[in-house]
């Protein structure tokens, strides 16, 4: 939904700058990547995108905004959480032990019920999930490195799922300024001064 709103902004020829208000503790990689892709397209049109952080700019919230032209954060904004996790619930024990229901799976192949929650994952499935999480983490640290003009090892040093206050994020290079949304709007206006 939010990606569509940004796409509509991108298609509006009267837009000269965008202030992106981020107030998110995170979300799915797919949704974050869709939103980031739309922001990238806005920037390719030469339109500055300035981020303004509210209470949170963590995980997916940071993913979508790391490449903004300028990032404003409140001193206490929870920022970063550059990390990835995945989980697949296993309710088989609860069904058997508490509800006294046994499950008999019938599958087309060994891994067809991997996401079915009715059994624990086997080692091959755990290895697959771990590789997937590590691949996404590598992408995340790479896009942060590009957006914040840092090296991937420098990002990894401050990432690993940790959360920083806005003031700490400023000190380590994850944001550019401590300021309010009004500061971000003022900066956006100055960035387009004279642009028609």
Where are these regions (language model features)?
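C-terminal intrinsically disordered, low-complexity extensions immediately downstream
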Residues: 186-196
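Small-residue-centered hinge/linker elements
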Residues: 1-49, 56-147, 195-196
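Active/binding-pocket-proximal capping segment
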Residues: 25, 160-164, 181-188
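Amphipathic alpha-helical substructures
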Residues: 149-179
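Short, well-structured beta-strand/strand-turn elements
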Residues: 70-74, 173-184
């Amino acid at each position: 939904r939010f990606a569509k709103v940004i796409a509509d902004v991108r298609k509006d020829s009267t837009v000269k700058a965008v202030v992106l208000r981020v107030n998110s503790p995170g979300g799915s990689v797919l949704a974050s990547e869709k939103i980031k892709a739309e922001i990238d397209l806005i920037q390719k049109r030469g339109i500055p995108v300035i981020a303004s952080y509210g209470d949170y700019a963590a995980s997916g919230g940071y993913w979508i905004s790391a490449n903004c032209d300028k990032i404003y954060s409140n001193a206490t904004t929870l920022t970063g959480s550059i990390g990835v996790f995945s989980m697949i619930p296993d309710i088989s024990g609860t069904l058997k032990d508490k509800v006294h229901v046994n499950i008999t799976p019938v599958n087309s192949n060994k891994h067809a019920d991997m996401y079915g929650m009715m059994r624990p994952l086997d080692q091959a499935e755990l290895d697959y999930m771990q590789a997937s999480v590590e691949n996404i983490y590598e992408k995340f640290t790479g896009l942060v490195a590009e957006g914040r003009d840092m090296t991937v090892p420098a990002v990894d040093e401050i990432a690993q799922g940790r959360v920083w206050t806005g003031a700490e994020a400023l000190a380590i290079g994850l944001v550019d300024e401590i300021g309010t949304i009004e500061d971000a709007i003022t900066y956006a206006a100055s960035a387009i001064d004279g642009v028609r």
